[in-house]
């Protein structure tokens, strides 16, 4: 599952999905 990269955010993946959700407040 991938999405557009926001500033300071990486591609959403199994290893960083939680951190990505925290950074963006959404999936």
UniProtKB/Swiss-Prot annotation:
GO terms for molecular function: metal ion binding; phospholipase A2 activity. InterPro entries: PLipase_A2_dom, PLipase_A2_dom_sf. Ca(2+) binds at residues 11, 13, 15. Residues 1-27 are annotated as: Disordered. It holds the Pfam family Phospholip_A2_2. It is found in: Secreted. Its main location: secreted. Keywords: Calcium, Hydrolase, Lipid degradation, Lipid metabolism, Metal-binding, Secreted. GO terms for biological process: arachidonate secretion; lipid catabolic process; phospholipid metabolic process. One of its GO terms (cellular component) is extracellular region. Expressed by the venom gland. Gene3D superfamilies: Phospholipase A2 domain. Belongs to the phospholipase A2 family. This is Phospholipase A2 2. It comes from Opisthacanthus cayaporum.
């Amino acid at each position: 599952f991938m999405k557009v990269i926001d500033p300071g955010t990486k591609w959403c993946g199994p290893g960083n999905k939680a951190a990505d959700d925290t950074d963006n407040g959404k999936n």
